[in-house]
């Protein structure tokens, strides 16, 4: 024997507990066969709407058994309940519950979306149903452009799009005029005649009289039932709750479409939400480009010094030297270090600031006393003239080699400066040559703002001191630089009898500078990341607001067959779309900022990685901060959601 289509046995539905307990349904037993036209009539508060919610699987009984074709509904998980609503029931609501932002056709298509129908099939089916219901020319009209009767016909088409076996009509004439009400009831009779089961919920006895069977409910109990006046269908259709919903790809594609529609519905709010993400992403791109540019520039300048240099400074390790005031390195130390194995050149150095004069031109520059090996160690070439020789150093001659900045401030034509005299410290110095330009140093100091004199001449005429501020050692074989550094350290330690000096190589300085620059980049990135975090909080806030504003829409989607995962996916995808759009705009604006900064002369380094990371972070932000709103949306109670204003 075939089980009845719908069977309720001793069903109760309680709300609240204790003194506040309300019995909306109290011991309801009911059987409805396939093909019946049943009206459930009762006044407000009688329990008829609660009964409809139970029949449509929007709610579960507190006690008792509700079965569809013998399958106990209480044993079904949420996904199978959603499938049951999607495949078996079609809802017609008193307030229509159409989505205001989409067309009549798209409203009709909603259940078909969750049934996994292809877009072309959905549209064809929706258009056909609307045409049969007299709305063929209003397929693309939005609900606000339709009359109440037309909106209710759209709701009927939505109920039929998945070939629903049971039509549940909840006060369908309540918001219609008498003419539209009669048209709707005629339509329900036609659907009944075609073999569908119709369950009509109403408070109006005249409306109920149009049904073949009338059940009256009062205070949660059935008080009368006119009985089944119609034979059940001989061949009952098979129960279809196990049918699967849309494929993941189709689900995501539809969610993306709905996300853009939702964002367009409130452009100003969307723009404000995107702004937070855009600021965060553009800040990440710009700041990392600035940080990387600064790091690359500093590293390039240090590397231009050559990887073969050792720097000897006076003072014990940890001692801070100021102005070369520590007298532990001498010219003899430099000469002795120059004799060590693998030392290509040992350059003694001492410097001061002084004013150079040429006629009416005065210029204050850095004056540095060095040996003839300075160009070798510093990898500097001559632009004009020659560098002074060892003989010049030994004879303490008054010669000077100028950087291009210094020469340009003293002479109108720097090429003609060679052979002329400048006054330095009150004494004349002949310009022996002009160095090739090198630009700024690692610290931003102009390396061409310099004047070089023989170290011996400087000690005698300018410095008034016989000790050095540094010795630079140029190593011949860089593979042995560590070994050479150790040898120089041991040599000076033996020579001085105490460790009153410090030796560092270019590699260690590079490592230290790189660490500092990396820390700077991390700091900049952290500041930008905080901006992105603030943007993410904005995304979560707006999505929570969206869930609150679209509660009824969520209820409609659940009633028409959306699973929890469908709702959750929809809101997560919306968050990802916000994050993605903000990421794209942020990357573009970030590159624009970088371009402007570069035009201002600041060094920047644009690489794909920061942009990819920033965009990925924006997507990740959308995902992370969209999870809570999405979960909240998917956990809404369908009945409460449909009842929300």
Swiss-Prot record:
Homodimer. ATP binds at residues 42-49. Keywords: Antibiotic resistance, ATP-binding, Cell inner membrane, Cell membrane, Membrane, Nucleotide-binding, Translocase, Transmembrane, Transmembrane helix, Transport. It is found in: Cell inner membrane. One of its GO terms (biological process) is response to antibiotic. Non-canonical ABC transporter that contains transmembrane domains (TMD), which form a pore in the inner membrane, and an ATP-binding domain (NBD), which is responsible for energy generation. Confers resistance against macrolides. It is a multi-pass membrane protein. The gene is macB. Its EC number is 7.6.2.-. GO terms for cellular component: plasma membrane. This is Macrolide export ATP-binding/permease protein MacB. It comes from Hyphomonas neptunium (strain ATCC 15444).
